[in-house]
Amino acid sequence: MLDSNLLRNEPDAVAEKLARRGFKLDVDKLRALEERRKVLQVNTENLQAERNSRSKSIGQAKARGEDIEPLRLEVNKLGEELDAAKAELDTLLAEIRDIALTIPNLPADEVPVGKDENDNVEVSRWGTPREFDFEIRDHVTLGEMHSGLDFAAAVKLTGSRFVVMKGQIARMHRALSQFMLDLHTEQHGYSENYVPYLVNHDTLYGTGQLPKFAGDLFHTRPLEEEADSSNYALIPTAEVPLTNLVRDEIIDEDQLPIKMTAHTPCFRSEAGSYGRDTRGLIRMHQFDKVEMVQIVRPEDSMAALEEMTGHAEKVLQLLGLPYRKIILCTGDMGFGACKTYDLEVWVPAQNTYREISSCSNVWDFQARRMQARCRSKSDKKTRLVHTLNGSGLAVGRTLVAVMENYQQADGRIEVPEVLRPYMNGLEYIG
């Protein structure tokens, strides 16, 4: 959520920045609502002051032995008018807040202006895509050869965009997540967390999934005996519960940065993705991811973004997977991001790079929703923290990249050296 003072005092400047990312801010409507808010605010305050004054007069009149009934009736009438004014003001403030919740974050000045993914800018590349002297098999074919990927069974159990993994393929999937967690906790300074896979609506508002992206989530219905409680939703990413751990907290600045990681399944409806990536593991309703989250001082967030992106890159480098680093243009960034790097791994069967990590600086956008603040020891003042999140990495897509990049002519899959300790020294699958 953007700073309400910024929206109130600099709507034209805000609108210009939002236009860079393709969002049209209705400045005239905001101004009209703000003018109405001022009128209602003054009216409410005047009524409050008048009622307080008249209430005080009742006591004074009573002390003088005067008839207080006319004053009492007047105070009651003022109270009714005040209640009505407060209700009208609350309704208007709710309307303003509802609008504010739909406004995306402002892009950082250095983010390239563009409309969509075609305007993203490549920053760097690492590694050279392997040249094969045999016909490349995709991960689906390789998985079926080794009885490791069973999409038909998943369709029977659930439906499309799910998978059943078996045997050594399932083991490699587990090995990848363990390797990522160990790297981030032992070398990159993150603390490991186990978090709920179901979260409440306050949590989803905190990180910006609600209200705008309700259709992208899998929602649950309450049990009959809990019908009065709020519904839950399955997490689309561990960013949601991890970041919300600091909701409504005031953190001493000497405790920052807070660096957290978690391995969780992620659940997404993939609304709007009909017909895209229908084969294989690239786009699933359920997939695993190792997430990184940092909570930092405002002045440290841009440096933290570079660091976090480097942590994701290190996973790919140790696995020996060629990738490129992209800075997303204004039109392709996520709703809450002010700056985002994507890492795209080389997928041989598609002869292209595919996204495997997205690392974003969210600035104070989530912190304002969550009321997550930090406090300096020197002056005891509080200010909003900055939050960052990044994939470190998407486990299923990493499995795809390993299977395809490490395939052999006979269909075997070489196990990357860094994964062998997690697979009992196994060198090849098959």
From Swiss-Prot:
UniProt keyword annotation of Cell membrane present: no
CDD domains named among the record's database cross-references: SerRS_core
Main localization, broad class: cytoplasm
Q: Name the EC number(s).
A: 6.1.1.11
Annotated positions binding ATP: 268-270, 355-358
Give the EC class as a word.
ligase
Q: Which reaction does it catalyse?
A: tRNA(Ser) + L-serine + ATP = L-seryl-tRNA(Ser) + AMP + diphosphate + H(+); tRNA(Sec) + L-serine + ATP = L-seryl-tRNA(Sec) + AMP + diphosphate + H(+)
- Gene3D superfamilies associated with the record: Bira Bifunctional Protein, Domain 2 (3.30.930.10), Serine-tRNA synthetase, tRNA binding domain (1.10.287.40)
> Which biological process terms from the Gene Ontology are attached to this UniProt entry?
selenocysteine biosynthetic process; seryl-tRNA aminoacylation
Write down the SUPFAM superfamilies for this protein, in alphabetical order. Class II aaRS and biotin synthetases, tRNA-binding arm
Free-text function comment from the UniProt entry: Catalyzes the attachment of serine to tRNA(Ser). Is also able to aminoacylate tRNA(Sec) with serine, to form the misacylated tRNA L-seryl-tRNA(Sec), which will be further converted into selenocysteinyl-tRNA(Sec).
Question: What family is this protein classified in?
Answer: Belongs to the class-II aminoacyl-tRNA synthetase family. Type-1 seryl-tRNA synthetase subfamily.
Let me see what the UniProt entry remarks about domains: Consists of two distinct domains, a catalytic core and a N-terminal extension that is involved in tRNA binding.
Q: What is this protein called?
A: Serine--tRNA ligase
Q: Which organism is it from?
A: Salmonella paratyphi C (strain RKS4594)
